[in-house]
Amino acid sequence: MALDPVRLEIFKSLYSSVAEEMGITLRRSAFSPNIKERRDYSCAVFNKGGSLIAQGDHMPVHLGSMPMSVQAALQIADPGPGDVIVLNDPYAGGTHLPDVTMVAGVYPEAQARPQPSAARRKRPLFYVANRAHHSDIGGATPGSMGLAEDIYQEGLRIPPVRLMVGGIVNTDLMRLISANVRLPAEREGDLTAQLGAIATGRVRLARRRR
């Protein structure tokens, strides 16, 4: 079956606009100049298999490796409805530790709220993800960008874990992150902005499926 170039361009613009709007939410909600002014962030949309299908006009270094972080999140944490996975692990598709990634599934409206375990195993329609450069993630040097002999000196390394479970923020994990970084209030603000960008992506994709 031949591809219709008109339909292809329509769908490309449709899904790319979701990633762009996620980026707008993130930039306007963030606390740190790294995100608000330097615009050191990226947002993207993935299909139900975790393959990249659309991205915003953001940071190539983020977008090139983000699919590996999404695959790691799906394999290790398997986000269900209302879940958001956070990670910054370079061994799971991350870039450097200050770049924090969030991944979440977009489910049909009937499954958008937390469901019993059988429903949680159903595949989502899409995944949405964003990555943002935090101005500090702990470690020996302010800004987490100093010379280091191993990754443990660089800062807090976060494997794929749930920052939001069934629509509820995991406050224990948020406190753990805040206790290991400089300017914890700013870090919490930027993480919350990333959660807001995820919510924007979910809402926009759900509306486009109606």
Language-model features: where?
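Regulatory sensory and allosteric helical modules in signal-transduction proteins
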Residues: 48-55, 67-89
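Short, basic/aromatic recognition patches
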Residues: 14-38, 74-75, 86-95
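A short, hydrophobic, proline-anchored segment that marks a local hinge/packing element in signaling
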Residues: 99-109, 129
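Short, small/polar residue-rich loop motifs at catalytic or cofactor-binding pockets
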Residues: 37-40, 100
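Short, basic, low-complexity termini and linkers enriched in Ser/Thr/Gly/Pro
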Residues: 110-121
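A short, polar/charged loop-to-alpha-helix boundary motif
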Residues: 61-73, 135-144
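N-terminal leader/propeptide and maturation segments of large enzyme subunits in energy/redox metabolism
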Residues: 2-10, 157-210
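Gly/Pro-rich active-site capping loops and adjacent beta-alpha segments
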Residues: 123-180
